[in-house]
């Protein structure tokens, strides 16, 4: 570990294999807390490369508890968070819309870190039990069309690194790795990021990891989603090739709205917003969910364009299918807990 730490501290990039070696030492507890902290900060100051992120993500994926399912394709809508915008849980709400449109979702997520409410927090407030076994999560994906992959329960090797991350309190490579390490091996992904300079590199990383089609996005108003209030930078990766462009709501027939209209609050408030959107309430909250669900449907190759995706997402809500997915997930997790009681 000392040799790898010295190399990074000197501003020299690691190869993918070296990044894998460093990550393995950290995930197995062989690296000391001081070495982990120094490595993470040296890497942050130098700037993480595509090869370094790819190598680290490979190790984290390999060491995760795998979620097995029988769906031919699953999509994830997990983002980095950390944008400080305090929006409601847009990608989590969009996940129900995507599932309502017939595309299976393996939603990877966690509790809030820098925001008020993480995906795990809002799902609990919606009455969904999260303490499922890996086998039960796979069944939920198969039977309901959506499953929640609670990161701390599935990335148990993180126990060696988590205390150091908390003590540092600064962004580091692990802020990027969560959305890159879906334990159900999602082949399609919508990934929001907190920095526009990350869209293209992380799209390339997803291609390196075997994801077939992904959209990595950053709203220029600062949100780690496709924005309803400003242009969004989109790096679309399909079969390893990356194309970067900009999207505005008007491109898909939607109107812009101030970012204040999509602000969230406590987990209870955000749960109410999710339920209202899934129940068909019109307005900017619905529109931003339509936009992001459309991107996930495009990544899953369910539609050919974002505009088609918006139309299909609207059908998912207006037909009641998106709401029924939420209700089925709630009932499924309650039934499992009752059976195990």
From Swiss-Prot:
Mg(2+) 2 binds at residues 224-225. Anthranilate 2 binds at residue 165. It comes from Symbiobacterium thermophilum (strain DSM 24528 / JCM 14929 / IAM 14863 / T). One of its GO terms (biological process) is L-tryptophan biosynthetic process. InterPro entries: Anthranilate_Pribosyl_Tfrase, Glycosyl_Trfase_fam3, Glycosyl_Trfase_fam3_N_dom, Glycosyl_Trfase_fam3_N_dom_sf, Nuc_phospho_transferase. Homodimer. The keyword Cytoplasm does not apply. This is Anthranilate phosphoribosyltransferase. Its EC number is 2.4.2.18. Keywords: Amino-acid biosynthesis, Aromatic amino acid biosynthesis, Glycosyltransferase, Magnesium, Metal-binding, Transferase, Tryptophan biosynthesis. Its cofactor is Mg(2+). Catalyzes the transfer of the phosphoribosyl group of 5-phosphorylribose-1-pyrophosphate (PRPP) to anthranilate to yield N-(5'-phosphoribosyl)-anthranilate (PRA). The gene is trpD. SUPFAM superfamilies: Nucleoside phosphorylase/phosphoribosyltransferase catalytic domain, Nucleoside phosphorylase/phosphoribosyltransferase N-terminal domain. Mg(2+) 1 binds at residues 91, 225. Binds 2 magnesium ions per monomer. GO terms for molecular function: anthranilate phosphoribosyltransferase activity; magnesium ion binding. Gene3D superfamilies: Nucleoside phosphorylase/phosphoribosyltransferase catalytic domain (3.40.1030.10), Transferase, Pyrimidine Nucleoside Phosphorylase, Chain C (1.20.970.10). Pathway: Amino-acid biosynthesis; L-tryptophan biosynthesis; L-tryptophan from chorismate: step 2/5. GO terms for cellular component: cytosol.
